[in-house]
């Protein structure tokens, strides 16, 4: 049986195949377009891509880092920044020790000797009186800002424990040190705006400590925000890529029936031309 394009039967056979392919391909393409654009919202199915487990963990890590940095800002701000702001208000001056004294009444303190062990003890209160050269007044000397906050009556607050002799010997050593410096000027810090007679020997927090208190929490906050931002950017780029791929597939699918229809028309024109030549 002759199925060549020049025969009548071959012509009908080729035409039937092209029409069948055209009808099966075109409704499928139309159905896909109807699914994508039925509600007037193009590509609504691909608005949000499912995130992977790694992306979810990365986002959780970023938010955890940001929360931890906020907690660090709060803790360091209350424990270091606040005393530092009070410390920078103090100006340097020259002090001269007048006399030292250990109070007769020891002060109460608490200590821990284990997980569930707590005890009560007492420690000697050492007082160091100095003379400020700049204001020219008598003042009570403290070791640092923390000693002023814990007990403003004493030079320092030792670590509490049960050995009273050790606590007393430590206080006597400090008393002997200032007794030898009697009449010798040394540097100290006082607050001009405060009416209190409290001066400190050294500053506990310097500029470098404040730098670390602000740098590391800020770096943690920036790192967490960068992780979350990179994950969101990756998801957004994946979404754009998926949308672009879908649009390209739709365009290619719409061109296939048109090409087949054009081939069918060329076949009809050749058949008509062949009949005209025979007649």
Swiss-Prot record:
Coiled coil: none annotated. Residues 1-60, 229-279 are cytoplasmic. It is found in: Membrane. It comes from the Eukaryota. GO terms for biological process: action potential; detection of calcium ion; neuronal action potential; potassium ion transport. N-glycosylated. The extracellular domain contains disulfide bond essential for the gating mechanism. Residues 82-207 are extracellular. Keywords: Disulfide bond, Glycoprotein, Ion channel, Ion transport, Membrane, Transmembrane, Transmembrane helix, Transport. The keyword Zinc does not apply. The chain crosses the membrane at residues 61-81, 208-228. Isoform 1, isoform 3 and isoform 4 are widely expressed. Isoform 2 is expressed placenta, pancreas, kidney and heart. Isoform 1 and isoform 3 are highly expressed in pancreas and testis. The keyword Disulfide bond applies. Glycans are attached at residue 131. GO terms for cellular component: plasma membrane; voltage-gated potassium channel complex. It holds the Pfam family CaKB. One of its GO terms (molecular function) is calcium-activated potassium channel activity. Its main location: membrane. It is a multi-pass membrane protein. Isoform 4 cytoplasmic N-terminal domain participates in the partial inactivation of KCNMA1, possibly by binding to a receptor site. Regulatory subunit of the calcium activated potassium KCNMA1 (maxiK) channel. Modulates the calcium sensitivity and gating kinetics of KCNMA1, thereby contributing to KCNMA1 channel diversity. Alters the functional properties of the current expressed by the KCNMA1 channel. Isoform 2, isoform 3 and isoform 4 partially inactivate the current of KCNBMA. Isoform 4 induces a fast and incomplete inactivation of KCNMA1 channel that is detectable only at large depolarizations. In contrast, isoform 1 does not induce detectable inactivation of KCNMA1. Belongs to the KCNMB (TC 8.A.14.1) family. KCNMB3 subfamily. Interacts with KCNMA1 tetramer. There are probably 4 molecules of KCMNB3 per KCNMA1 tetramer. This is Calcium-activated potassium channel subunit beta-3. The lineage of its organism: Eukaryota, Metazoa, Chordata, Craniata, Vertebrata. The gene is KCNMB3.
């Amino acid at each position: 049986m002759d199925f060549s394009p020049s025969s009548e039967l071959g012509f009908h056979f080729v035409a039937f195949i092209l029409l069948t392919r055209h009808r099966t391909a075109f409704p499928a393409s139309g159905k896909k377009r109807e699914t994508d654009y039925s509600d007037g919202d193009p590509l609504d199915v691909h608005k949000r891509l499912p995130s992977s487990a790694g992306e979810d963990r990365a986002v959780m890590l970023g938010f955890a880092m940001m929360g931890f940095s906020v907690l660090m800002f709060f803790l360091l701000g209350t424990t270091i920044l606040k005393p530092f702001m009070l410390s920078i208000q103090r100006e340097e001056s020259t002090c001269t020790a007048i006399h030292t004294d250990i109070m007769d009444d020891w002060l109460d303190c608490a200590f821990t000797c284990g997980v569930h062990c707590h005890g009560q003890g007492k420690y000697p209160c050492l007082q160091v009186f100095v003379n400020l050269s700049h204001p020219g007044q008598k003042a009570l000397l403290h070791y640092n800002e923390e000693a002023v906050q814990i007990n403003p009556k004493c030079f320092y607050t030792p670590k509490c424990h049960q050995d009273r002799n050790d606590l007393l010997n430590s206080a006597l050593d400090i008393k002997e040190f200032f007794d030898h410096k009697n009449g010798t000027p040394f540097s100290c810090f006082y607050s001009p705006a405060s009416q209190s007679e409290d001066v400190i020997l050294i500053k506990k927090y310097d500029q470098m400590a404040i730098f670390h208190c602000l740098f590391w929490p800020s770096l943690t906050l920036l790192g967490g925000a960068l992780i979350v931002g990179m994950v969101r950017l990756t998801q957004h780029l994946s979404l754009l890529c998926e949308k672009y791929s879908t649009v390209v597939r739709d365009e290619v699918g719409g061109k296939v029936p048109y090409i087949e229809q054009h081939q069918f028309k060329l076949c009809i024109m050749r058949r008509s031309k062949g009949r005209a030549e025979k007649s």
